[in-house]
């Protein structure tokens, strides 16, 4: 009996040590970050956690996680993915006037939680310095869009995007026309509602 108990204790210890050694990815939620937490500090935390991280339109962490979420949704499986979108302001890419006006408000980070309940997609996005989400919405479709850069002098070679939409057949060309249209507000063109949750500019 004592030998059996000792063996059981040893087995528990082994599994405990294995768990510590393997170091499973720490999970954090958007609400874990106070509004006064610096954007750079949040960035470091989400990169060490189970988030998809996008820095200046390029994915730096969690790319496979985003694709796995999408694939699971296409199979009808419920799930959740968290996306952190981080922006800096490059003085070489904006006017001196704009840089002077906006530099103190950068870097910025937006925290998005996207869930699929088996039927619809629910999105909530919070600007890190705000207490409440700036976007809370539900969409019927998550559309993946991939393509080449629109011009030869673009700062990237190709793109990979995920867009929540009312229209499953929505295209990037339609979104671009809507973005530059003065007729309707952004995201509310004749193509229906849409909300881009993931952008990865690749190459160059």
Question: Which residues does each PLM region occupy?
Answer:
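Bacterial N-terminal signal peptides that target proteins for export
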Residues: 1-9
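C-terminal motif of bacterial Sec signal peptides marking the signal peptidase cleavage site
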Residues: 17-21
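N-terminal leader/presequence segments that precede the conserved core
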Residues: 23, 28, 132-135
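N-terminal export/targeting and maturation segments
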Residues: 25-111
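Extracytoplasmic electrostatic interaction patches
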Residues: 93-204
